[in-house]
Amino acid sequence: ALGGVIHYYTKSPIIKGSEKIKSSFTTNYTSANQGVSNNLVTNYSSENWGSITSLSISKFGDIKMGEKREHGFNSWGLTPLYSENSRYSYYPEASINSDENIQKNTGYSQVDLFQKFLIKLGETNLLNVNIQFSESSDIDRYDQLSITNAGSLKFSEWYYGPQKRFLISPSLRIFPNRKFMKKGAITFGFQKINESRIKRKFNALNRSHQIEDLKVFSLNGDFDTSFNNGHSISYGVESTYNYNYSKAYDQTLEIEGNQVTGLGEKFAIPTRYPSDGSSYSSFASYLNWSWNMSEFFTFNVGARLTFTGLKAS
């Protein structure tokens, strides 16, 4: 088996930049789903601190697949039937798709806000504060809404409710320039994630909701040093704590014509995860030694020790 890490970096503010304020705007359009994405970025740079702000607004329509079907599976990926049901509309029967190449119920929209501050502390130390927020519209599950039962669709509704994510992560970068600690970073992180799964079958008025409220805490310390003879050492510790609270319930739709005019009282159903809450925690430490033996050879050896805990009820 192969292992690896995909490490994403977000843009960072600049201190003492050549321009005090710099902004840019980009927009993208995709014809396959009539999607439009707009992004506005503003940078501010001063003598002792910098800021970068990014706002993205995206809206995507239903995906249209290619019409040339040379793979031999003539009906694969086509959408002959679809559901017009939503939070606020009610249709007792599946609808016929006038263009089967359009994958109905694949469109959604999303807003993303990204803010970073970089603050100089003293002569060498830096404080980086990373703040992110994102929220989506309802996101339909195309695969579930395509399942058939006795010649018709099984589900009239199956979608993720608006997904919300908030993150704040301050990171202190230090440069003590000592023998066993030339530089290091101490990073705290907190995320709050809300998601839900809502579904209802055709010929049924009960709409089920499964709602998750997840909180994630993390604390990392990473340090390294190097020596003149080609040797370098990196070491650190990490602690994480994840807590999820789940709830689930059914509600009966109150309808008038094709409109959902109200919802009945909630009654409990099985939750997706333990209903009294569940948590996962970990603590880990690592040590890595690297030796650049020559221009062509590098020797690495490392060790990591991890403790984990799981609690659910």
Where are these regions (language model features)?
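Transmembrane beta-barrel wall of Gram-negative outer-membrane proteins
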Residues: N33-K59, E70-D138, K164-F166, R173, ...
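Short glycine/serine/proline-enriched coil/turn segments at secondary-structure junctions
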Residues: I15-G17, A32-Q34, R178-F180
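Face-selective signature of the C-terminal outer-membrane beta-barrel domain
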Residues: K120-S134, P162-S313
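Solvent-exposed loop segments that connect transmembrane elements
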Residues: E67-E100, D143-E157, R200-R207, Y249-Y273, ...
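Solvent-exposed coil/turn segments that connect beta secondary-structure elements
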Residues: K11-P13, T30, S58, T240
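N-terminal periplasmic accessory domains that precede
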Residues: L2-T26, N38-L40
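Exposed loop/turn and edge beta-strand positions of beta-sandwich/beta-sheet ligand-binding modules
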Residues: L2, E19-I21, V36, V111, ...
